[in-house]
């Protein structure tokens, strides 16, 4: 596994230390960052971060900051080590917590992000809960994007648009689908 672009492009990331991580493949990450707006100066949130490869990619491509929320402590500690090895600790933060608690912490701090990337474990009925958590947490800037990585066998509840998120696009890569939901603009 390697970072595909930006200042850290080509740097290798060690494999996960647990068997419960499914890193986003290189080709899917490249496609993701080709579809996202320019990350330079932006704030990026990586939920269900696992190895942290997607947030590392955002930092490599110019994001001002990235916050990683990862439930498994072994992965969170390893991610902190990687960020230090790459000299990124001043632009990043790792929260070792499940998504709901991590979002609550960020909400209480008043943090908002241009891009929130969420990659919950496939086919465990976590997509709707992740979307609802992000909406309740009010962590997206007006016009910000929530990108969900999910299995092709999972669907997004059509009521997400009633929650202030608009499904803008979906892209399929084998069994993986990236869904791009935009935070409705404030009046």
What is each stretch, according to the model?
Residues 1-187:
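Class I S-adenosyl-L-methionine-dependent methyltransferase catalytic core
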